[in-house]
Amino acid sequence: AKVEVGDEVGNFKFYPDSITVSAGEAVEFTLVGETGHNIVFDIPAGAPGTVASELKAASMDENDLLSEDEPSFKAKVSTPGTYTFYCTPHKSANMKGTLTVK
């Protein structure tokens, strides 16, 4: 599955912002435009340690951003469920999406 991160006019969005994949299927996030963004999965309160570890591994470091030098990032989640992801610098601008793993 592929997700575009941002756009040419600087909107803080993921396109699409809702994705459904099979367990273990990679999602490729690719930067569009020049504004730096990242992808971080929200770890649900009370999530088992294995799920928390998996979501942390599927996330970029909060201090890293996609750029022209590194324009894409692949994430994989194997545990079925619905997970929220967001861009750390633009979280307050509601730049988020959901990944459903079947």
UniProtKB/Swiss-Prot annotation:
Its cofactor is Cu(2+). The crystal structure with reduced Cu(1+) has also been determined. The keyword Plastid applies. GO terms for cellular component: chloroplast thylakoid membrane. InterPro entries: BlueCu_1, BlueCu_1_BS, Copper_blue_Plastocyanin, Cupredoxin, Plastocyanin. GO terms for molecular function: copper ion binding; electron transfer activity. Cu cation binds at residues 37, 87, 90, 95. Keywords: Chloroplast, Copper, Electron transport, Membrane, Metal-binding, Plastid, Thylakoid, Transport. It is a peripheral membrane protein. It holds the Pfam family Copper-bind. SUPFAM superfamilies: Cupredoxins. Residues 1-102 form the Plastocyanin-like domain. It is found in: Plastid, Chloroplast thylakoid membrane. Its main location: plastid. Participates in electron transfer between P700 and the cytochrome b6-f complex in photosystem I. Belongs to the plastocyanin family. This is Plastocyanin. The lineage of its organism: Eukaryota, Viridiplantae, Streptophyta, Embryophyta, Tracheophyta. The gene is PETE.
